[in-house]
Amino acid sequence: MLYKTLNISKQAVHQHKSVIDRKMEELCYVAMIVEQVRADHPTMGVRDIYYMMRPEGIGRDRFEHYCQELGLSSVRTVNPCRTTDSSGVIRFPNLLEDLSVTKVNQVWQSDITYFEVNGKFYYITFIIDAFSRMIVGYSVSKRLFTEDTVIPALEMAVGFRKGVNLAGLIFHSDGGGQYYSKKFLELTETLHFRNSMCLYSWENGKAERINGVIKNNYLEHRNINSYEELVMEVDHSVALYNNEKPHIKLHRMSPARFEKNFTFAESDFTAPGGREIRLCNQKSRIEMQKKINKKAITNKRQTVNLI
């Protein structure tokens, strides 16, 4: 009835809303690009940033217009995705304040970073379990839109925890536009997740550290010349990190071994990245240690006899 009174169609209203939603994503896309580039190049102008990053789907003039609209044309940076904006988008509260994380699937944290390949930038999204530091989901994309970044990463994470009741899980992020887009919020609502956002980057430190670990410890040391090679190397790097890399906060265990010992003892386990591992249970490890100790004592006695 209202549509007839206003002489507009329901389809036109939905199309207009889709345009607004896409613009909000693009605004946050531009804001993230400018913020990340200026972290390394504090005085770089928006035109130079555009030619450096060449964001897919956004031309130079629109990029500069968005920067002007966001107040990013000057060197002083302001991230519009950190606060309520004029379209009515409201940030979620930070649910991690004063929270003690004591088990897997209690809190997942996510962040998006970029990686340069032959002068072109691609985007990598990670989702980690805050307790075990396991990368439970990730994606590599050519664009920064929700359907290319956080949604495939979250779908991977949910698939990885298949059969586990995830209702009530806290999904924590930095408040970027992808994390409050309509599509993403519909997915988290369906999963009965609780959305959480931080105001400052250090309040999402675990997710941000994963960015540095994968990029600096792995990807920077690979010979990557294409998007396809980047995808392959991210797969490989995540497998190595999850299954083999010792973590000081996990008693020098890898995330997979840590989860195995404290959560899934007695069962096989496959971590994201495709590498299957079979770990000994506590009893077999004790028996193995006894054999090692016994052999060491025997060798020592033989050495003494030789002397």
What are these regions (language model features)?
Residues 8-104, 254-263:
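Basic, flexible linker segments flanking DNA-binding modules
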Residues 55-58, 100-102, 117, 175, ...:
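Conserved, non-catalytic sequence blocks in retroelement Pol enzymes and Pol-derived host proteins
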Residues 59-126, 151-156, 160-161, 166-169, ...:
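Mobile-element integrase/transposase regions
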Residues 76-81, 140, 171-175, 189-206, ...:
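RNase H-like polynucleotidyl transferase catalytic core
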Residues 129-130, 140-145:
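A short acidic/small-residue loop/turn micro-motif
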Residues 132-135:
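Hydrophobic "anchor" residues
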Residues 164-179, 204, 251-255:
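Acidic/histidine-rich, metal-coordinating catalytic segments
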Residues 185, 189-193, 213-307:
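C-terminal domain-tail junction helix/linker
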